[in-house]
Amino acid sequence: MKKAFVKSYGCQMNVYDAARMVDLLGREGFAETEAMEEADVVILNTCHIREKAAEKVYSELGRVRDLKGERAGAGRETTIVVAGCVAQAEGREIIHRAPAVDVVVGPQSYHRLPELLARARDGKVVDTEFPLDDKFDHLPPRRVAGPSAFLTVQEGCDKFCAFCVVPYTRGAEVSRPVAKILAEAERLAAGGARELTLIGQNVNAFHGEGPDGRPWSLGRLMRRLAEVPGIARLRYTTSHPRDMDDDLIAAHRDCPAVMPYLHLPVQSGSDRILAAMNRRHDADTYRRLIDRIRAARPDIALTSDFIVGFPGETDADHAETMRLVAEIGFSGAFSFKYSPRPGTPAAESADAVPEAVKRERLAALQALIDGQARAFNLASLGRTVEVLIEKPGRHPGQVAGKSPYLQAVQIEAEPAVIGTILPVRLTRAGSNSLFGERAEAAPAAAA
């Protein structure tokens, strides 16, 4: 049997896309392998959001090239595929830089992967089109790999933030029809999924056509998904503050299946930098939005994204970001040094912040956020929460899962409980996860 190896970089959407590529190849007789040296097809599903992520791909391609040569010496062929957002952004340039690559395919074209592999027998293939047909109509039924599953409901972004390549690599905002989302959710639930995470580049801009022929909001979609038998938990990511509407906030208040967790990137606390980023909101608008969300769901855990060292950022701008973080209090965040992405407006700025200053600001911000994350976890100790058990734990006799607040939790239990939701009393905080013991029942969340 032919084998395929897939390595995915970056966001949850890439994780989802990688799984769908495996499904596609499975229909063609391929088995997935975790050992690259065994693979007849090697796929790197790439991320272009930061320069470091893109350069990692070329470094990995050097290793794959060497592997391809070794296998050729043993009489075995290897087809190398670069997929994802680097493929979309750089196209044929990838083959110029890495001639061992056979196929370059963008995120809107990977449903044609079997066809592209067949064409690659006759030469290099590049497909970075934005086809008019819906790629989801060409994908095979999902495989369920555990009690938690990603479900794509929206793709693309129309916001055009000055630092971001997503509108160029993923295209304009497109929402899937509600009927197709529900059908996929029902298949996932029938396969054992208990939790669905709805994903999209700008997921709360969802406006898919409902059965009534009218666009549905994300809040309405989540209420309907909560009615799917077997689905106990719903999450969504990633959101933009401008699309966080009253209906979605109300879903956090009124729909028990919607978990008390929200990832809502703000990027900066400085109005001047937010304007330069083309975020189309200011810091106080974000603060007021958080107040409304917390009024609806007081126990909600909030995480965010931050960029430090954006062109023109001053010490005063950075201080505003630190002030916003201190005032709001996050359970975690992703923070990065700004890196210019080719083709974006910010990449043309001459007002670069020195690398040493970026490093210093990033260290200060991460120290503040790490302290808040530790405080959030420590405040959870002694509480009883419902944990979705997802997989075996780090050590024999342990299982691991997630709290409603997306905290990793380890408990002592037999593997038979995987896929169930258990009440767990949290007893200890480690560096990356919480530890607990089974309890009688979890109390109701704060209202």
Swiss-Prot record:
Gene Ontology CC: cytosol
Enzymatic class: transferase
Catalytic activity: N(6)-dimethylallyladenosine(37) in tRNA + (sulfur carrier)-SH + AH2 + 2 S-adenosyl-L-methionine = 2-methylsulfanyl-N(6)-dimethylallyladenosine(37) in tRNA + (sulfur carrier)-H + 5'-deoxyadenosine + L-methionine + A + S-adenosyl-L-homocysteine + 2 H(+)
Keywords linked to the UniProt accession: 4Fe-4S, Cytoplasm, Iron, Iron-sulfur, Metal-binding, S-adenosyl-L-methionine, Transferase, tRNA processing
Subcellular location: Cytoplasm
Sequence positions that bind [4Fe-4S] cluster 1: 11, 47, 85
Binding site for [4Fe-4S] cluster 2: 157, 161, 164
Entry's EC annotation: 2.8.4.3
Alphabetical list of InterPro entries matching this protein: Elp3/MiaA/NifB-like_rSAM, Methylthiotransferase, Methylthiotransferase_CS, Methylthiotransferase_N, Methylthiotransferase_N_sf, MiaB_methiolase, rSAM, rSAM_horseshoe
Keyword match Isomerase: no
Domain TRAM: 378-440
PROSITE patterns listed in its UniProt record: MTTASE_N (PS51449), MTTASE_RADICAL (PS01278), RADICAL_SAM (PS51918), TRAM (PS50926)
Molecular function via GO: 4 iron, 4 sulfur cluster binding; metal ion binding; N6-isopentenyladenosine methylthiotransferase activity
Start and end residues of each Radical SAM core domain: 143-375
Record-linked CDD domains: Radical_SAM
Domain MTTase N-terminal per the UniProt entry, residue ranges: 2-122
Family: Belongs to the methylthiotransferase family. MiaB subfamily.
Subunit structure: Monomer.
Protein role: Catalyzes the methylthiolation of N6-(dimethylallyl)adenosine (i(6)A), leading to the formation of 2-methylthio-N6-(dimethylallyl)adenosine (ms(2)i(6)A) at position 37 in tRNAs that read codons beginning with uridine.
UniProt cross-references to HAMAP family, sorted A to Z: tRNA_metthiotr_MiaB
Protein name: tRNA-2-methylthio-N(6)-dimethylallyladenosine synthase
